[in-house]
Amino acid sequence: MAKDIKFSEEARRSMLRGVDTLANAVKVTLGPKGRNVVLEKKFGSPLITNDGVTIAKEIELEDAFENMGAKLVAEVASKTNDVAGDGTTTATVLAQAMIREGLKNVTAGANPMGLRKGIEKAVTAAIEELKAISKPIEGKSSIAQVAAISSADEEVGQLIAEAMERVGNDGVITLEESKGFTTELDVVEGMQFDRGYASPYMITDSDKMEAVLDNPYILITDKKISNIQEILPVLEQVVQQGKPLLIIAEDVEGEALATLVVNKLRGTFNVVAVKAPGFGDRRKAMLEDIAILTGGEVITEELGRDLKSATVESLGRAGKIVVTKENTTVVEGIGNSQQIEARIGQIRAQLEETTSEFDREKLQERLAKLAGGVAVIKVGAATETELKERKLRIEDALNSTRAAVEEGIVAGGGTSLMNVYTKVASIVAEGDEATGINIVLRALEEPVRQIAINAGLEGSVVVERLKGEKVGVGFNAATGEWVNMLESGIVDPAKVTRSALQNAASVAAMFLTTEAVVADKPEPNAPAMPDMGGMGMGGMGGMM
């Protein structure tokens, strides 16, 4: 396919139009008085959102060169979302400001490589200063503030703070769509996995349709059990102890299942069988987790063990187990705390090494089940459109809170970027490097300016006043007051601000050093089919 090539100024100008188109659509959402953007969906109702990365991903421009510019900035939002989970609009605003300011200087004759060096120096200094002024997050109220600012909803802030308090910082907090109008929190203590009883005849509570086992033994194996003779020796030992039994196996079927059900119905002993969670290697790892949590062993041929050799000593124990049609929850496993800690450490090490998003999610789930528990926030709303928008906001708030726990918090509302202004301005440089530093200085003002503009105020007036204020004092766009941002609970996670600045600078530097752009030439439209009007059947009379 033939290519279209543009060089230097023409190339950069074409891409800048794309940058501006995307950034202008995204930046209207910034701040407490930011507006929403409506996105058309091919199926279902349109999506209304103020989430920068969601908007950026939807934008596709007709002109190939403009589209490349737009995609570069979308990459800033996407990367910031991957690293910090929030701050995508701030990242987009910073990138646009650096690109526009940089392009003016390149057009005026500045060397792009010199500008790049200056930008990198300035961003390094800004990040060091951000780390210095960040404060560790302490207590439930701080967590609630971070989540409330991100979601623009105090109720959501309280909900997330409560969830994190209940399951710990390593706990898993998931979002589900609720059938009702209200948003509520559901916390599962202990370890839960998504496998239910093998037969409904095993239930102990017919009203709730669940089986509850108090102080049970737990047989854990990766084998399929179809012959009752295989587990008869260990069954007899459990019956002698007078305790209930939970069997976790690849499957329990045929004669073995029938015998267990008959004995359960006769009241000989209380037993529930469930399938092992997960698949393949993940199943082995999860069975090992359950064994460590309950102080039992996984009976597997890989370790030279068969079911006939199993004894009561090789079974796990727990305070209580609840089995429903779809889930099994193990509460108060009596495993050795040192072994559990070692296992948690092992999973954390795997988390740091993995590059797969899917694996990371599954490891995080396993970690939470061992370390704390799982909290589910059930998101409710009046309409499907509102539900989608609310779910996106809560997701951002959740990511924001996790980022705050990791690296602490800084003053919100773009104030922290202005607080590092003096440090960046004090860097000694000359020529194009100094110009690069000035580009970053100009960009640092942009989030505050845009928040003020979205609140219907003159951005430059707010920026100039902020330069003269003490560190931590900023403009509360929601009320129009000048306040101490940290004391007023207007905070941003340091990680979110840092990621936004780093990613914006990275893309801006790449943009400014671009000298040629290559795109596919648009294919000419195929000619329309000729009119077939003259080929009526009437003209064929002579052929009869």
Swiss-Prot record:
Catalysed reactions listed for this entry: ATP + H2O + a folded polypeptide = ADP + phosphate + an unfolded polypeptide
GO molecular function terms listed in the Swiss-Prot or TrEMBL record: ATP binding; ATP-dependent protein folding chaperone; isomerase activity; unfolded protein binding
Record: residues binding ATP: T29, L30, G31, P32, D86, G87, T88, T89, T90, G413, N476, A477, A478, D492
GO biological process: protein refolding
Top-level taxon in the UniProt lineage: Bacteria
Keywords assigned by UniProt, alphabetized: ATP-binding, Chaperone, Cytoplasm, Isomerase, Nucleotide-binding
Location of the protein in the cell: Cytoplasm
UniProt cross-references to Pfam families, sorted A to Z: Cpn60_TCP1
EC number: 5.6.1.7
Gene Ontology CC annotations of this record: cytoplasm
Main location: cytoplasm
Subunit structure: Forms a cylinder of 14 subunits composed of two heptameric rings stacked back-to-back. Interacts with the co-chaperonin GroES.
Similarity section: Belongs to the chaperonin (HSP60) family.
Role of this protein: Together with its co-chaperonin GroES, plays an essential role in assisting protein folding. The GroEL-GroES system forms a nano-cage that allows encapsulation of the non-native substrate proteins and provides a physical environment optimized to promote and accelerate protein folding.
Protein name: Chaperonin GroEL
High-level lineage: Bacteria, Bacillati, Bacillota, Bacilli, Bacillales
